Amino acid sequence: MQKERIYVCHTFYHVYVACLKELNLEKERRGKASLVLSRMSNDFGNLKARAEKSGLFEAVYWFDEKPFTFFEELTELKKDTGSLPGNLRNRMRFCRRLGELEEPYVPVNFREYGDIYVFCDSDPIGYYLSWKKIYYHAVEDGLDCIRYYDTAHYDNRGHFRLKAAMAALGFIFIQNGYGKYCMDMEVNSIEALDHPIS
């Protein structure tokens, strides 16, 4: 039996928004979601226990997500080769390999969930889901953060359209709604975006 939904959170703000999303549901739908707390960049303290007691979530998991720098073999793939084809070839290998290396640390089988909500899909979880070909919903990392700092465009400056096309085909991964397996991107205000994703 498929589980309803799961939220992957990296910050307290992400958890706050996940709670609001759950509280906004009809009462009979609440309490059926899972919550994943990534410890890659945040110390959540006793939040796991508190979330379990809240009744808002059916299950709460720790996620020992690893940054790409944890995997020494990936460092070489981040180096500039001096050519666009060489860089794109390394980028394809990097995206695939980071997803693969992350797998032992992933605490749940995401294929068991109907809806997957990922805050900050630029973190390794985005690469993992892309590598596994698992569809998900991206959620804006912070209130209007894309309005003020569009990481997808900044991180992929130089030949952005080519890279976005490659991401749409699944050859590389780009965050914030550009990846093949990202179904949509939830933002606070689409009117505020310079580059709305269509």
Task: Label every model-predicted segment.
Residues 1-3:
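Generic start-of-chain signal for non-secretory N-termini
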Residues 6-173, 177:
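Active-site and donor-binding regions of nucleotide-sugar-utilizing enzymes
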Residues 186-198:
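Long, charge-rich alpha-helical interaction segments
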